[in-house]
Amino acid sequence: MNRFFESLINLFFPPKCPFCGKILDTVGICPKCERSLPWVPEEEVAFTEKDLTCAAPLWYEGAVREALLRLKFRGGSALAEPFGELLARCAAERFGGEFDTVTWVPVSQKRLEARGYDQSRLLAEAVCRHWDTRPVQLLNKVQDNPAQSG
């Protein structure tokens, strides 16, 4: 998006901190929330199985949990940008920052129609904007599984 349109959008819909709602100059997290978030220490890995290692920037609790639930279930699609930045930074710091492909696990057609967006795809796109690349759709949802949370 060019800077003019981005500035125009920010004039009418200014970026807000996803945790406290404070209006910001740019998309991101306010300094107060940045300091108080439940960060996962770099030396802690969330999951390791054979050659697969997963990591997360934040623990899923409190304000983080609430913001992610807004993103997923309550029309908070704008939250994908700040969370995408966090994911991009975490992956670059913990895994070296060079990746062959970024993809996502899509939602079912039923959930896509109900929400109006695929939060996983939005997160993948936001991560890729920080790495100047594009996500690649590698997976298709063939079955509508029961919701894991809500």
Stretch-by-stretch model annotation:
Residues 1-150:
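Glycine-rich phosphate/pyrophosphate-handling loop used in enzymes and phosphotransfer proteins
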